[in-house]
UniProtKB/Swiss-Prot annotation:
Gene3D superfamilies: Cysteine Rich Protein (2.10.110.10)
Location of Phosphoserine modifications: S238
SMART domains: LIM (SM00132)
Domain notes from UniProt: The third LIM zinc-binding mediates interaction with E4F1.
Function: May function as a molecular transmitter linking various signaling pathways to transcriptional regulation. Negatively regulates the transcriptional repressor E4F1 and may function in cell growth. Inhibits the transcriptional activity of FOXO1 and its apoptotic function by enhancing the interaction of FOXO1 with SIRT1 and FOXO1 deacetylation. Negatively regulates the calcineurin/NFAT signaling pathway in cardiomyocytes.
Subcellular location: Cytoplasm; Nucleus; Cytoplasm, Myofibril, Sarcomere, Z line
Name of the protein: Four and a half LIM domains protein 2
Alphabetized UniProt keyword annotations: Cytoplasm, Isopeptide bond, LIM domain, Metal-binding, Nucleus, Phosphoprotein, Repeat, Transcription, Transcription regulation, Ubl conjugation, Zinc, Zinc-finger
Pfam families, alphabetized: LIM, LIM_FHL2-3_N
Subunit structure: Interacts with ZNF638 and TTN/titin. Interacts with E4F1. Interacts with GRB7. Interacts with SIRT1 and FOXO1. Interacts with CEFIP. Interacts with calcineurin. Interacts with FOXK1.
Taxonomy of the source species: Eukaryota, Metazoa, Chordata, Craniata, Vertebrata
Residues annotated as domain LIM zinc-binding: 40-92, 101-153, 162-212, 221-275
Length: 279
């Protein structure tokens, strides 16, 4: 007796008929398509065994149904893009959704490298320095007056030049007497200490820190011989081309402060009236 060879689902004999094996079990074509065939996204019909099943992200189409949602041209073996569950050819997608290059005004095609800045887009080859016309790419750039500059060109064309070293000032500049300086170039003429953020003074157009200015130019106190800066509200006494700090203007003998008092002189000494009576 001949062994039976039936459809695993409907039990109809498969002798002399077309069948499909699934997990080693045979099915007639009707049962296989009913049970296992994918449904076409476009027409809603099963994709039969005799049809090519085209799939994209767990969705399936008949070959004849796999076309652009707008122009209806076939997408078989062609690049395409998906937008909100719709498949579009590259031309339709670009016309509808792709951004336009800020420079050449042409569409930036899907898959093309582009540069974006403040809501605008450029082809990579169109995003160039306004001065040297070279592509900026991923390098640093500086925008000015709706134009983009690579850093070297910006420094040459727009950055202020330090009055000391004559090089561009890109960050952290100092203005003194309406002239720009690098912070590291604006230093004391004597000790070369940076003056940015420090108190300083000038003589003959040269800047000095307070210590150097006092050492070089300040008058010396006749009492302690230290400089009298005259800066910051420092008070001092001047008499016959000699100067004293207020705290140093005292009687030579009794050390009484003579500020605001009468006094006498004995050679280079100053004396209070009481000590001067014995002269």
């Amino acid at each position: 007796m001949t062994e039976r060879f039936d459809c695993h689902h409907c039990n109809e004999s498969l002798f002399g008929k077309k069948y499909i094996l699934r997990e080693e079990s045979p099915y007639c074509v009707v049962c296989f398509e009913t049970l296992f065939a994918n449904t076409c996204e476009e027409c809603g019909k099963p994709i039969g065994c005799d049809c090519k099943d085209l799939s994209y992200k767990d969705r399936h189409w008949h070959e004849a149904c796999f076309h652009c949602s707008q122009c209806r041209n076939s997408l078989v073996d062609k690049p395409f893009a998906a937008k909100e569950d719709q498949l579009l050819c590259t031309d339709c997608y670009s016309n509808e959704y792709s951004s336009k290059c800020q420079e050449c005004k042409k569409t930036i095609m899907p898959g093309t490298r582009k540069m974006e800045y403040k809501g605008s887009s450029w082809h990579e080859t169109c995003f160039i320095c306004h001065r040297c016309q070279q592509p900026i790419g991923t390098k640093s750039f500086i925008p000015k007056d709706n134009q983009n500059f690579c850093v070297p060109c910006y420094e040459k064309q727009h950055a202020m030049q330090c009055v000391q070293c004559k090089k561009p000032i890109t960050t952290g500049g100092v203005t003194y007497r309406e002239q720009p300086w690098h912070k590291e170039c604006f230093v004391c003429t004597a000790c070369r200490k940076q003056l940015s953020g420090q108190r300083f003074t000038a003589r003959d157009d040269f800047a000095y820190c307070l210590n150097c200015f006092c050492d070089l130019y300040a008058k010396k106190c006749a009492g302690c011989t230290n400089p009298i800066s005259g800066l910051g509200g420092t008070k001092y006494i001047s008499f016959e081309e000699r100067q004293w700090h207020n705290d140093c203007f005292n009687c030579k003998k009794c050390s009484l402060s003579l500020v605001g008092r009468g006094f006498l002189t004995e050679r280079d000494d100053i004396l209070c009236p009481d000590c001067g009576k014995d002269i």
